Amino acid sequence: MVVMNKTNLLLLILSLFLAINLSSAQLRGDFYAGTCPNVEQIVRNAVQKKIQQTFTTIPATLRLYFHDCFVNGCDASVMIASTNTNKAEKDHEDNLSLAGDGFDTVIKAKEAVDAVPNCRNKVSCADILTMATRDVVNLAGGPQYAVELGRRDGLSSSASSVTGKLPKPTFDLNQLNALFAENGLSPNDMIALSGAHTLGFAHCTKVFNRLYNFNKTNNVDPTINKDYVTELKASCPQNIDPRVAINMDPNTPRQFDNVYYKNLQQGKGLFTSDQVLFTDSRSKPTVDLWANNGQLFNQAFISSMIKLGRVGVKTGSNGNIRRDCGAFN
């Protein structure tokens, strides 16, 4: 057995830190300038076309990006389909609720990029997902921002790698902060990225515990607004089909804005992991700040999304460019 002294341990941590930062340092905005200069417009056009078909494209793509980056980094490994010999990430129970429109957005954008002769097999699925995510945020009324590019697609995808990597709707602030810290993201990044819940929906089963069986003292979570409880119970009665979905933001579910934080101030966070951002004194001042200033929230969200896009990236020979986003080459 090798005993590691403090010096060697510090050197190991430093080497890992440098390796992570060297990978993300290879990302740049003009990565495809010489190979596929119009790639961002091609992707945006494909995303716009997809949104015209269904609004679900927007929250589905945004959620897909988070689930990809938090498991093995932003490498499109969540796109891989399972085979007889490998159960992939997308088939882990925590990913089964990912809407198919998110996957289809990346597939359609990839087809559009590869239809341009000089772009064919030059742009990674990981970068296409990154660009598409930026575009759905902007097309829903959110900020426009520049993305860093140059990711390679991951070479592995397994359901077992997902366990413990994604936040649960029951998480408290300590659990949220710890999970985000594992990905190099700060408490402020966590609060900003939680703001993505201004869009999209969740299944009723994810909130049953807050409505009907919260704890030994209260059947209903006392932090939920009483009028909101009535609304939620009407939408999610106990005998309802578990596949029925409800909006994350009860007020402006199709608009990317700071109303998510205003909702938290009124006790209208859908998940425990949402409402705790307001009930915990450590995060409450940030919620109040962004509830009162949408521009500050947008700036924080952009910064945190760029940081998220650097998590666990593969560059150079650490990955490849998939011909089919759903299968390894």
UniProtKB/Swiss-Prot annotation:
Compartments it resides in: Secreted
Co-factor binding details: Binds 1 heme b (iron(II)-protoporphyrin IX) group per subunit.
UniProt: heme b binding residues: 197
Record has Glycoprotein as a keyword: yes
E.C. designation(s): 1.11.1.7
Cofactor(s) needed for function: heme b; Ca(2+)
Protein residues bound to Ca(2+) 1: 68, 71, 73, 75, 77
Residues involved in substrate binding: 167
GO biological process: hydrogen peroxide catabolic process; response to oxidative stress
Catalyzed chemical reaction(s): 2 a phenolic donor + H2O2 = 2 a phenolic radical donor + 2 H2O
GO molecular function terms noted in the UniProt entry: heme binding; lactoperoxidase activity; metal ion binding
Entry keyword annotation includes Signal: yes
An example Gene Ontology CC term for this record: extracellular region
Binding residues for Ca(2+) 2: 198, 249, 252, 257
Site note Transition state stabilizer, residues: 63
Glycosylation site residues: 215
Annotated catalytic residues: 67 (proton acceptor)
Main subcellular localisation: secreted
Signal peptide boundaries: 1-25
Disulphide connectivity of cysteines: 36-119, 69-74, 125-325, 204-236
Stated family: Belongs to the peroxidase family. Classical plant (class III) peroxidase subfamily.
Record's function text: Removal of H(2)O(2), oxidation of toxic reductants, biosynthesis and degradation of lignin, suberization, auxin catabolism, response to environmental stresses such as wounding, pathogen attack and oxidative stress. These functions might be dependent on each isozyme/isoform in each plant tissue.
Descriptive protein name: Peroxidase 51
Organism: Arabidopsis thaliana (Mouse-ear cress)
GN (gene name): PER51
